[in-house]
Structure formats: C-alpha cells, structure tokens
UniProtKB/Swiss-Prot annotation:
Membrane topology value: Lipid-anchor
Domain PH: 203-311
Statement: the UniProt record of this protein carries the keyword Disulfide bond: no
UniProt region (Disordered), positions on chain: 1-20, 134-160
Name of this protein: Phospholipase D2
Length: 933
C-alpha cells in the first residue's frame, strides 16, 4: 500500500529527532587541528556564485561549525497575548564568528524542512552516492538529542535547559554535511557563498529581505513618484560586510547591487523615513536603499548590526579624512617611484605575471598592442597577450576606458574595447561616459589582486615608453623590422613582425611626435604613421609610482566605485556578463602575496578628483593637498607638470595653486628666508600644429592661459612678484623646460622633451604623484576625474638644506636627486653635488645651465618657441633663416658638445605681442573657455 503524503512528510511539530538519524556513510568527518584559514573559500568564488537552493558549497570543507546558544530575550508581542523568547545563537566557523537570533518556531520550521529533504533524498535511487561523506568516528553517536516540545515559557531553569537542548540539536546537525549544506540550514544560519571569504572581511549580517526599487541619487535613475505607483518590492539575499552591503538574486545567485559605505552613510528605522512598515533605510552618497523586515524588532536589529559594522571595521570610509579625501593616510606603506615609462612598464609587466585573482585597469587611453619590456624579441611582453594569458589562467580582468568624443580625439577607445573583449570571456571592458562631452576620465591606474597598485601620468598607450636617454631616432634594421599588414578580421590578434632580431624600441604607431602629427588608424598598430627616416620622435617624460597594501586597497575601492557606478548607470552594462566588483577588506591588506623590489617605507594617502558624473560623488582632495603642501613648505618646491594654468581671477580660472606659490614666496621674502621654486613644463602644449606658423588654435589657447599664469596680466605669478620685490623674484623661482638632440639623416636634429609628469616635491620629505595637471580641469573635481597619492617620508637620511645638515626623506630625496641628475647631465659632471637644492651655488648652477643650453640650441637649431619671436611677424622672419645644423653640421656638432643635460629656460616672451585665444570664427573659438583651463 502506498504511503500517504502525511506519512511521507511528517509535520515536525514534535521535532522527533529519530526521523533525522543518519546512516554511517552520511555522517561527515570533521578534521580537527587543521588551520581553518587555509581551507576557506578563495576570493575568486565571488565570480562563480550559484542559486542558494542548488546547495552550493558554503562552509569550508573539514572546518567545523560550532553553535552556542548564548542568551535569550523575552518580549511581549503587540498582536498576541503572552511572551515570546528569542534565542541568540553564536556560531563559529574557523576564524569567523557571528550571531543570529531565532524563535523556537524557526527551529521547528528548520526541522520540517530537513525532514522533507531527507524523505526526498531517500526516494532518489542515487541520492546516497550524491553526498560526499565518510564513516563517522568510532564511538560517535548518530542519534540527535530530542528537542523539547513547544509550550508556554516557564522558569529560568527550564529556559536554560531548553537553550542547551537547542544547542546540542544544532551542533549534532552541523556535523552532518547532508544537513549542514542544505539550503534551509544555510538560510537558518544566515550564511552564503560570500560569508567565509577572508578577503571580504568579517562575517556580517545576512538573510532574506525585501528591498524596494529606486532610490538612486543619479540623474535618470531617480523616480519622482510615490511608492505604490513607481516602486516595486523584491525578495533578495542581503549581505553586509565591513565597508559595503550587497543583495543577490535568490533565483540565480547573481549580485544585483553593491552599496559602498561612504561619508553619506546613515541608517534609519521607521515608517516616517522609509515609507514602509518595519522598514530600514540605508543612505549613502549614491543611493537610499529601503529594506522591509518582518517585524519592528528585526528592523532594529538589522539597523544596529549594519551601523556597528560600518562604524567598526568600516569606519575609514564613512568619514572624510585629511584634505577631505575618502581615504586616510596609511603609514608603513611600501612605495616605489618611476621616472619615465621604461621602468614603470617593466614593473607593470612583472606585476601582471604575479596576478592570481584580479587585474583592474583604467586609462585615458589604452593601446592593447604596446610592449611593456623593450626591445621586444617576442610577443611575451605585449600587453594584450599578457592579459589573455592571465585570463586563461582564471584571472578576471576589468578595464574602464574613457569614451571620447570621436570628432575631438583620435584615441579610438572603441577599437581598444573590441580588441580586448575578443581575447577571453574573463576580460571585461566598459567605456564611460556617454553624455558628458567636455570632461574626461583622465586617471591612470592598474591594480593587481587589490594589493599592488600603479598610478601616475602614464597611460598604457603609444608614445609613453621612454628612458633616461630620450632617443630622437629609432631606425634599427629596416629589413628586420618591416611591419606586416594588420589582420582582416578584428577577431584575430594584430599580427606582429618577426621580432627575433628586432632592434626597435618603438614599433609602428609607438614611434610618434604628437605635435607634428596626431595618431591615426589605430586599428593598424604596426604601421608607421610618420616617416622615421626624416622625422625625429618626441621624447616623453613622465612620473609613476607603485604602492602596496592598504593604499592599493583604497585605489581598488575607487576603481570598484567607478566600475559599479558605470554598470548601474549604463543600461548596456546591466547584463550579467558584466559583474559587480567587490572591495577587499583592509583587515587583510598587509597580507602581501608579493612585493616589487626597490620599495621604500612611507605614509601614503590616496587623493582624487571626482564628480557626480564620473563617480557619483564630489571630491577635490588633490587640490586641497597641493594647496596645503605649498603653504606648509619650508625650503623649496619642485614641480613637474604637463600644464600650469592657475592664479584665480574668480571667473575664468578658479584653482589657487599659483596664488599659494606667490604667497609662499612673498612670505619668504618678507622673512628674509631662502626659498626656491623650480617649475618644469613642456616647451609647447601637446597638440598637433605647425609651431613655425604659430602652432594652431589649440596650442595657442593653452599658451595663452599658461602665460597668463606665469608672466602676463595682473593675476600672473611674475607680475605680482615684481610688484612686491622688483627683480629679486629671480632669486626665488625658475621656470624651465627640457630639450635634447641627436642625429638623423646625416645632420643634427633637436626636439623638446614632452613633460607629461604630474609631480610635486616639497622639502625632500613630501611628494605628490598622480594624473592631475595643474589646471581647473584636473583639480576642481567637477571636471576631469583624477587620481594621486600624497607620500610623506618616515625614514630619513642625512642631507643638506641651504648649507645646513638636514634630515631628508629617503623616498623624496632619491626621486628628486634622480630627476636633477638626468636634467643637469650629472653623469658628465662627476663633481656635481645634488644634495642641497636651496643654496645659492646650486640655484645659480641651475639657472646658468638652463641659460647656456637654451642659447646653444637656439644658435644651432633656431628652435621654437623662442624669446626672439615676440610676434607672428617676427616668427615668420625667424623661421626663414637656415639653422647652423643645416648649414654646417660639423660645426653644429662641435657646439652641441657644450650642452649639459636637458635643461633650458622656458621662453616667457614667446608671442607676447599676440592675442593667443582662438578667434570666434574657429571651432576652437566657440568652445567654452573651461575646456582649456
């Protein structure tokens, strides 16, 4: 006779434990004495989440789960007569400990679910073989102690006895994988696949919750209607960690949203703030998330737990820090500087090889086919191929690219995205923004496993690789370096030449001179676009830095914020193939799987410029750090920057970096203090244009605002200094550029060294390195997005400052001395002492070197820009005269032997008689002035 449904599915009201007895092969053997941390789930599990009801592996194999009923709460329900008891259950799994609160009826519901599970499994012929298990230890009883029946609450002795019964009941079940891994048990214990990943931090609050749609603080995502009209409620699995919360789709296991805690964090309970009975409202700068609980008591409990997590381990991110940065100063950080792209790219390549979990990249421009180590003799060091190999190993690569206005920029981010996305499913690329046409994502960042982060001025793009030689030519052996045609299908990697005997440093599009000609046909990466037989390349000077540990976590968090923001705001990225990213906890930040050699210990703080359009929040901590560092400097400032547009007039230019420099010099002059300011800028802006005819509208527009900052007009630095001290300003500030020379086509050639650095050194103790130029675009926060780090030395070494013994920081001093050594040609001047940047002798040597080199280059090449050309008429007359390098190459070579290093004075009088802003009739003239500033 067939069994009735009643006999198959007992009610479970009496919690008869005999119905849950296990056969010997169903009892899980626990391995005591092992290190639990070694058996916890790897971080990559976040990319392979499954629906909860598919019984995914939640607990670490072999690591026991121990339950302890630590207390009870008795309360009177508002809708019932009598009291209810809430049991606090503390659970431990390895290093993870968490508490859940349950009523007795929850135990009854669990018992019924487990009974149904056992009955169903007993009806499946192969069910016994589907459970991975082993025999129980000898003498281990397989009977589960019976639970007391439900009844009225009695004495404290009876309550304590009931606690012990519940505790034994749970612990007995938790030794059996058959029940422990069942979804009803994991829901009861409030655990998921994200609970026991050490890099995600402590085990926080979890459970099934109802959440309300909407609440985003992003234009276009905010509903202006009322709850019942515009919103919908959905059941989700909520996970709260120390610095964020997320919810997952119950049906698929996919992460549906991630809310990072930030200074806008606030938790509220009640219908007034949530418009929902038993509601909890979690506010951040990006969203007001409304959750609905089953009771007011649960709402208070959840609000308390979320708040305690955020104010405890996650407190770093719910408050602003020095300079109003989202990240605090991180002492004891390993940091290493890089001057020029050769060392930076090589270190990036080494870090990519060490990646085990994730690689994050964001650039203004990314060229997939660049080589990170040169000269290349194979494709092993080609960026796209390296990323493809790591993706094949299981590493997840996430790339954020600036989506340019194609009519204005020729960086072809669409090609870069396609080229990378076709390599492997583990490589995901997103572009942003769509609607913003004036501003850019200008930051440059690469993060490996959220423990090592590179940033600075260097995009992983054409033209950026260079070394201290600043070569103007790269001819090699043309027979060995002929580039093939690009592929006919973009599904193939671009073919490369046979590199076995390659001698070239810059292949194809990498050989460039951005003022002579901007890049074209980027989908043909190995075709030259300028004639390297007749045109010298333009050397590229840049500064980068790598940091380890907590600052790398902070930088990864910034990337994750931008990635998740882009996924949320752009409809095309809401599909599951673009995953939400999760930040690792700072609690494991010092567990470094690898470090790069050459690092020095310092205090590092991450700074940024972001706005609502770029990251969903506003911050301009880079500007604040610049102003503070200049204001507090005691001896000198050394600035290398691609742009220098400052000195606020309250209308056109708003940042006050130049104003702070003026104030600091005036303070030194008033106090009779020796104070120096060194400023290095590119001799010309990096836009395509013929400087012999004035350079074009873009070049002239940037020159206008640069000269307005330096020396022209009432707001300029030199105008204000001259008004206060006359010619003595020359004792305080020097403005220079860099130039070099070489041989091409049988005669000498010269070219400026394009300074793309974004660096400030103060007093040989403080350094700012990043992607931010000195202009409003980079510094105000409301325009371009930028990243930087403020590095403060904690390890000192003896040096000199104005002839007096001085304790200089190892990081800042080594960086500054390296820069000065290359700039001044110290390799050919063995007696040059670079320790003291302030004394009169060194400052005079600096000025004399710049003047001598500038005079020689002007005599030999009649190079531009020049102080001799103060008007367009003078410029036309100047360029028609044949330079000595053409007329008499041997004599020119002889004179060039007198050049020392690369330093030349910046020509402050170039085209000073001309109005350099574009005319209104030009396309540049109709653009807002903010584009140039």
């Amino acid at each position: 006779m067939a069994a009735t449904p009643q006999s198959l599915f007992p009610s479970g009201d009496d919690l008869d434990s005999s119905q849950l007895q296990m056969e010997p092969d169903e009892v899980d053997t626990l391995k005591e004495g092992e290190d639990p941390a070694d058996r916890m789930h790897p971080f990559l599990a976040i990319y392979h989440l499954q629906p909860l009801k598919l019984h995914p592996l939640v607990f670490a194999p072999g690591v026991p789960v121990i339950a302890q009923v630590v207390g009870t709460e008795r309360y009177t329900s508002g809708s019932k007569v009598g009291t209810c008891t809430l049991y606090s259950v503390r659970l431990t799994h390895g290093d993870f400990t968490w508490t859940t609160k349950k009523k007795f009826r929850h135990f009854q519901e669990l018992h019924r679910d487990l009974l149904r599970h056992k009955v169903f499994m007993s009806l499946l012929p192969l069910a016994r073989f589907a459970v991975a298990s082993s025999p129980a230890p000898e003498g281990d009883s397989r009977e589960i102690p019976s639970l007391p029946r439900a009844g009225p609450e009695g004495s404290s002795r009876r309550t304590a006895s009931k606690q012990k019964y519940l505790e034994n009941y749970l612990n007995r079940l938790l030794t059996m994988s058959f029940y422990r891994n069942y979804h009803a048990m994991t829901e009861f214990l409030e655990v998921s696949q994200l609970s026991f990943i050490p890099d995600l931090g402590c085990k926080g609050l979890e459970g099934v919750i109802r959440k309300r749609s909407g609440g985003h603080r992003v234009p276009g995502l905010t509903c202006c209607g009322r709850d019942q009209v515009c919103y919908r409620w959905s059941k989700r699995w909520l996970v709260v960690k120390d610095s964020f919360l997320l919810y997952m789709c119950l049906e698929t296991g996919a992460i549906s949203f991630v809310q990072l805690f930030d200074p806008g964090f606030k938790v509220q309970v009640g219908k007034r703030s949530t418009e929902a009975r038993y509601g909890v409202r979690v506010d951040t700068s990006h969203r007001s998330l409304i959750l609905k609980c089953s009771s007011y008591r649960q709402a208070r409990w959840w609000a308390q737990e979320i708040t305690e997590l955020a104010q405890g381990p996650g407190r770093d991110f719910i408050q602003l820090h020095r300079h109003d940065s989202y990240a605090p100063p991180r002492p004891g950080t390993l940091a290493r500087w890089f001057v020029n792209g050769a060392g930076y790219f090589a270190a990036v390549a080494d870090a990519i090889l060490r990646a085990q979990e994730e690689i994050f990249i964001t650039d203004w421009w990314l060229s997939p086919e660049i080589y990170l180590k040169r000269p290349a003799h194979s494709d092993d060091w080609r960026l796209d191929i390296m990323l493809k190999k790591k993706a094949e190993e299981g590493v997840h690569v996430s790339v954020l690219l600036f989506k340019e206005v194609e009519l204005a920029l020729a960086i072809n981010s669409g090609y870069s995205k396609k080229a990378l996305m076709l390599l492997h499913p583990n490589i995901k690329v997103m572009r942003h923004p769509d609607q913003v046409t004036l501003w850019a994502h200008h930051e440059k960042l690469l993060v490996v496993d959220q423990v090592v982060a590179f940033l600075g001025g260097l995009d992983l793009a054409y033209g950026r690789w260079d070394d201290l030689h600043y070569r103007l030519t790269d001819l090699g052996d043309s027979s060995e370096s002929a580039a093939p045609q690009p592929p006919t299908s973009c599904s193939d990697l671009p073919a490369t030449p046979d590199l076995t005997h390659n001698q070239l440093f810059w292949l194809g599009k990498d050989y460039s001179n951005l003022i002579t000609k901007d890049w074209v046909q980027l989908d043909r990466p190995f075709d030259d676009f300028i004639d390297r037989e007749t045109m010298p390349r333009m050397p590229w000077r840049d500064i980068g830095v790598v940091v380890h540990g907590s600052p790398a976590r902070d930088l990864a968090r910034h990337f994750i914020q931008r990635w998740n923001f882009t996924k949320t705001t752009k409809t095309k990225y809401k599909i599951p193939i673009y995953p939400y990213l999760l930040p690792k906890s700072t609690s494991t930040a010092n567990q470094l799987p690898f470090t790069l050699s050459g690092g020095q210990c310092a205090t590092v703080q991450v700074l940024r410029s972001v706005d609502r359009w770029s990251a969903g929040t506003l911050e301009n901590s880079i500007l604040n750090a610049y102003l503070h560092t200049i204001r507090e400097s005691q001896h000198f400032l050394y600035i290398e920057n691609q742009f220098f547009i400052s000195c606020s007039d309250g209308r056109t230019v708003l940042n006050k970096v130049g104003d702070e420099i003026v104030d600091r010099i005036l303070k030194a002059h008033k106090q009779g203090q020796c104070f120096r300011v060194y400023v290095l800028l590119p001799l010309l802006p990096g836009f395509e244009g013929d400087i012999s005819t004035g350079g074009g509208n873009s070049i002239q527009a940037i020159l206008h605002f640069t000269y307005r900052t330096l020396c022209r007009g009432e707001y300029s630095i030199l105008h204000r200094l001259k008004a206060a001290m006359g010619t003595e300003w020359r004792n305080y500030i020097s403005v220079c550029g860099l130039r070099t020379h070489g041989e091409l086509g049988g005669h000498p050639v010269s070219e400026l060294i394009y300074i793309h650095s974004k660096m400030l050194i103060a007093d040989d103790r403080t350094v700012i390195i990043g992607s931010a130029n000195i202009n409003d675009r980079s510094l105000l926060g409301k325009r371009d997005s930028e990243l930087a780090v403020l590095i403060e030395d904690t390890e000192m070494e003896p040096s000199l400052m104005n002839g007096v013994e001085y304790q200089a920081g190892r990081f800042a001093l080594s960086l500054r001395k390296h820069c000065f050594s290359v700039i001044l040609g110290a390799a050919a001047r063995p007696h040059l002492d670079l320790r003291d940047p302030v004394c009169d002798a060194f400052f005079q040597l600096w000025q004399d070197t710049a003047e001598s080199n500038a005079n020689i280059y002007e005599q030999i090449f009649r190079c531009l820009p020049s102080n001799a050309t103060r008007s367009l008429r003078a410029l036309r007359e100047y360029v028609v005269v044949e330079p000595l390098a053409t007329v008499s190459p041997p004599l020119a070579r002889s004179e060039l032997n007198q050049v020392q290093g690369h330093l030349v004075h910046f020509p402050l009088k170039f085209l000073e008689d001309e109005y350099l802003l574009p005319s209104l009739g030009s396309k540049e003239g109709v653009m807002p002035l903010e584009v140039w500033t």
